[in-house]
Amino acid sequence: MFTLTSYFGFLLAALTITSALFIGLNKIRLI
């Protein structure tokens, strides 16, 4: 169960980083 929790935590971190980069690119395009 610990490995499953860490796996979901890794997915959440990856999703957050990806969304942050996507928003950053959109802001750069708007400028």
Curated annotation (Swiss-Prot):
SUPFAM superfamilies: PetL subunit of the cytochrome b6f complex
Domain of life: Eukaryota
TM regions (residue ranges): 4-26
Functional summary from the UniProt entry: Component of the cytochrome b6-f complex, which mediates electron transfer between photosystem II (PSII) and photosystem I (PSI), cyclic electron flow around PSI, and state transitions. PetL is important for photoautotrophic growth as well as for electron transfer efficiency and stability of the cytochrome b6-f complex.
HAMAP family given in the database record: Cytb6_f_PetL
Protein name: Cytochrome b6-f complex subunit 6
Keywords: Chloroplast, Electron transport, Membrane, Photosynthesis, Plastid, Thylakoid, Transmembrane, Transmembrane helix, Transport
Keyword Transmembrane tagged: yes
Keyword Nucleotidyltransferase: no
GO cellular component: chloroplast thylakoid membrane; cytochrome b6f complex
InterPro entries noted in UniProt: Cyt_b6/f_cplx_su6
Family to which the UniProt record says this protein belongs: Belongs to the PetL family.
Subcellular localization: Plastid, Chloroplast thylakoid membrane
Membrane topology of the entry: Single-pass membrane protein
Major place of residence: plastid
Pfam families attached to this UniProt entry: PetL
GO molecular function, one term: electron transporter, transferring electrons within cytochrome b6/f complex of photosystem II activity
GO BP annotation list: photosynthesis
Subunit structure, interactors included: The 4 large subunits of the cytochrome b6-f complex are cytochrome b6, subunit IV (17 kDa polypeptide, PetD), cytochrome f and the Rieske protein, while the 4 small subunits are PetG, PetL, PetM and PetN. The complex functions as a dimer.
